[in-house]
From Swiss-Prot:
The gene is aspS. Catalyzes the attachment of L-aspartate to tRNA(Asp) in a two-step reaction: L-aspartate is first activated by ATP to form Asp-AMP and then transferred to the acceptor end of tRNA(Asp). This is Aspartate--tRNA ligase. It catalyses: tRNA(Asp) + L-aspartate + ATP = L-aspartyl-tRNA(Asp) + AMP + diphosphate. Homodimer.
Length: 592
């Protein structure tokens, strides 16, 4: 039906007859000549119909936006005065000789030109129309090229693309599972995989030493801009490779991807330990474009008569940190109050501040509601450590260390944006040496997942003292966004059983949920390691999209619904009966 894509016609085709198909982006009648902008996935081309062919001209005059048409005509160069440098095809146009309406279009339920006026609900309900917008089409085509490049790299490095099951068994991986009832085994359920983690480890045990898969994963969790109930991972696993080798290979892949797709050289990825990242930036995925850093000052404040500072300064689990903002002395009291409310979102009880109005005047040049609690030597040391200059402001976080990190880390990012401090376009790094466990309500939880190997300890040593142990785990971070994370895996049964016990998983529960893994670990399991990248997130970053919804063809809403298909929906009584399921209606409270 066509000889060329609309966006591919150029000056080399001048004088040639072409057959094009696509959608009418815009139609206008100017002085008896009809101009069409015809659109397909590759772009737009201008088609001109004049009255010399009355029948064809009459059809052209009836066209409206989004009619699907076939055009036949001759390519000609535009006069210099009419060249459109904003269009890829702006040097040429097609003189129409024939026109077929393949399918007419009703008036659209949303605007494709002024899409900002469309609600998110409208865009998702009529996604097949929203995807016709060039911006959306370009993102999906970019995504296809990225997956192709990833496959080429992994294929050329000896990785095998192997599929793993979608219907599997529920395992505790941090989020709720999507469950699928079994008709054959009444009362029993499959789970949709949160990741192929255990299957890819089993593939290593099977001798397939380099595996990859671009795979759908499912998590029933609260959604944010970078979360969806179903998402896509670039999943990788290797045998007989150390964490350093895995990082080197996947860094090579990511650097090559950015060079091929964006002509960006990411350079070498620096390494930073988890503890350093949390200390300096209050985050395990720091945005290094932002020059602001947290500075510890608790040692200066243990004796001050101001409990807001001295209490956390004397608490082993407390922290007092200072954040200098260049030029921040210009902040109004209302703006400081807004920052105080902002850190309150993250659990902070307040936000002390110190304005450096004139450093040459000593204490006289410093303004702060807490100045009366601090002697001159303490103030001077705070100024020295933070590097504060005249015109700056120093903001203080004082609380439990976790609260300070989260609240001041978030404030660091906000202030960096507010004061336009970000430097450079791309700043990657590896974050390494994560804690093996974290304590929540007195119980140990895996920081990554229960199959992550500790670094440099035996099973007995780990179980005897699990606190403060370091895992052999690594995250790739770019511009404050975690692109992917992985680890060396546990490859012996003794260590895996010890980790389960530390996590409060009884031997019986471990046997019921992970018996197949524990048994597999008895039969010559090789050392193995891997990681998974979030493909949607990578595409979002590379294209500058504001949400992963804008780089997925048919995403869900933030309430995990699909307005297009009205999913999820109710099952009919016969289906429920076959599955042995009864739906319990939610009780409704009545007055009186």
């Amino acid at each position: 039906m066509r000889s060329h894509y609309c966006g591919d016609v150029n000056k080399s085709h001048v004088g040639q007859e072409v057959t094009l198909v696509g959608w009418v982006n815009r139609s206008r009648d100017l002085g008896g000549v009809v101009f069409l902008d015809l659109r397909d996935r590759e772009g737009l081309v201008q088609v001109v119909y004049d009255p010399d062919l009355p029948e064809v001209f009459a059809v052209a005059s009836t066209l409206r936006a989004e009619f699907c048409v076939q055009v036949k005509g001759v390519v000609r160069a535009r006069p210099d005065s009419q060249v459109n440098g904003q269009m890829k095809t702006g040097e040429i146009e097609v003189l129409g000789k024939a026109l077929t309406i393949i399918n007419a279009a009703d008036p659209l339920p949303l605007s494709l030109d002024n899409y900002q006026n469309n609600s998110e609900e409208q865009r998702l309900k009529y996604r097949y129309l929203d995807l016709r917008r060039p911006e959306m089409a370009q993102r999906l085509m970019f995504r296809a090229k990225v997956t192709s490049a990833v496959r080429r790299f992994l294929d050329s490095n000896g990785f095998l693309d192997i599929e793993t099951p979608i219907l599997t068994k529920a395992t505790p991986e941090g989020a709720r599972d999507y469950l699928v009832p079994s008709r054959t085994y009444k009362g029993q359920f499959f789970a949709l995989p949160q990741s192929p983690q255990l299957f890819k480890q089993l593939l290593m045990m099977s001798g397939f030493d380099r595996y990859y898969q671009i795979v759908k994963c499912f998590r029933d969790e609260d959604l944010r801009a970078d979360r969806q109930p179903e998402f896509t991972q670039i999943d990788i696993e290797t045998s007989f490779m150390t964490s350093e080798q895995v990082m080197a290979k996947t860094e090579e892949m990511m650097r090559g991807l950015f060079l091929e797709m964006l002509n960006v050289d990411l350079g070498e990825f620096p390494r930073m330990t988890y503890n350093e990242a949390m200390r300096r930036f209050g985050s395990d995925k720091p945005d290094l474009r932002n020059p602001l850093e947290l500075v510890d000052i608790a040692d200066l404040l243990k004796e001050v008569e101001f409990a807001v500072f001295s209490a956390p300064a004397n608490d082993e689990e407390g922290r007092v940190a200072a954040l200098r903002i260049p030029g921040g002395a210009a902040l109004s009291r209302k703006q400081i109050d807004d920052y105080t409310k902002f850190v309150g979102i993250y659990g902070a009880k307040g936000l002390a501040w110190m304005k450096i109005n004139d450093l040459n005047l000593g204490l006289e040049g410093i303004q702060s509601p807490v100045l009366k609690f601090l002697n001159e030597s303490i103030v001077n040391e705070i100024v020295s450590r933070t590097g504060a200059q005249t015109g700056d402001i120093i903001l203080f976080g004082a609380d439990q260390a976790t609260v300070v990190a989260e609240s001041m880390g978030a404030l660091r990012l906000k202030a960096g944006e507010d004061f336009s401090l970000l430097q450079g376009e791309w700043r990657p790094l590896w974050v390494v040496d994560f804690p093996m466990f974290e304590k929540i309500n007195g119980n140990f939880h895996a920081v990554h997942h229960p199959f992550t190997a500790p670094r440099g300890v035996t099973a007995a040593e780990l179980e005897a003292n699990p606190a403060n142990r370091v895992s052999d785990a690594y995250d790739m971070v770019l511009n404050g966004c975690e692109l992917g994370g992985g680890s060396v895996r546990i490859h012996n049964q003794e260590m895996q059983s010890a980790v389960f016990r530390i996590l409060g998983i009884t031997d019986d529960e471990a046997k019921e949920k992970f018996g197949f893994l524990l048994e597999a670990l008895r039969y010559g399991t090789p050392p193995h390691a891997g990681l998974a990248f979030g493909l949607d997130r990578i595409i979002m970053l590379m294209t500058g999209a504001s949400s992963i919804r804008d780089v997925m063809a048919f995403p869900k809403t933030t309430t995990a619904a699909c307005p297009l298909t009205n999913a999820p929906g109710f099952a009919n009584p016969q289906q429920l009966a076959e599955l042995g399921i009864a739906v319990v209606e939610k009780a409704v409270k009545t007055e009186g």
